[in-house]
Amino acid sequence: LFTLAPYMLIGGGVFVVPDGPLNMFLALSALALIRAFSSNETKDWAATGLWLAFAMACKYQAGLFPVSVLAYLLLTKGEWRRLLTSGPWIAALIGLLGLTPVILWNIQNDWASLAFHTGRVGPSFQPANFAQMLLGQAIYLVPATFVFGTVALWQATRRDATLTTRLLAWIAIGPI
């Protein structure tokens, strides 16, 4: 679905922007995470962290991935127990390594990227702005992609949804 969106098909794949690599590394992170959830093997958790580290080096939005996974673990019945194992913590520590070059660059450049990003936000939540953002995404993704994506997220709320479907839905909700 995602690659059908004009931006990802044309803009993210042709122009020199960090979105293409970001999305590739996030997709690899999600694949590794699904394997880690199934196997609970250290190598799968480490792979999740490695791909997340590359994503974190691409763009700040990659930080929504671990936040979404943490929300899933805390808010889904019984999943919090995974936090008692070393796997998620290994993934998180390796993932944070991807921020190291970003932080070092910001230290050397008076936190320029943070000043840029924080200077573009307003002081409070505005429902009209949120609605405008959702409409913009719907147009940006082409109506068919937006509708199919919305249906896929809705399907993830069903009782018979698989762990993989629910987990991917939680990861997708973060950026939305």
Please describe what each predicted stretch is.
Residues 1-7, 52, 56, 70:
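Short helix- or helix-capping micro-motifs
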Residues 44, 159-172:
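Membrane-interfacial loop-to-transmembrane alpha-helix junctions, especially the N-terminal start
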Residues 54, 66-165:
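Transmembrane-lumen/periplasm boundary regions of multi-pass, lipid-linked membrane glycan transferases
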Residues 44-59, 94-96:
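Membrane-interface alpha helices of multi-pass inner-membrane proteins
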Residues 11-22:
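Short acidic/glycine- and proline-prone juxtamembrane loop motifs at membrane-interface regions
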Residues 29-45, 151-157:
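Membrane-interface transmembrane helices that cradle and orient dolichyl/undecaprenyl
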Residues 20-28, 66-67:
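Membrane-embedded alpha-helical segments of multi-pass membrane proteins
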Residues 8, 56, 169-176:
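Transmembrane-helix signature of polytopic, lipid-linked glycan biosynthesis machinery
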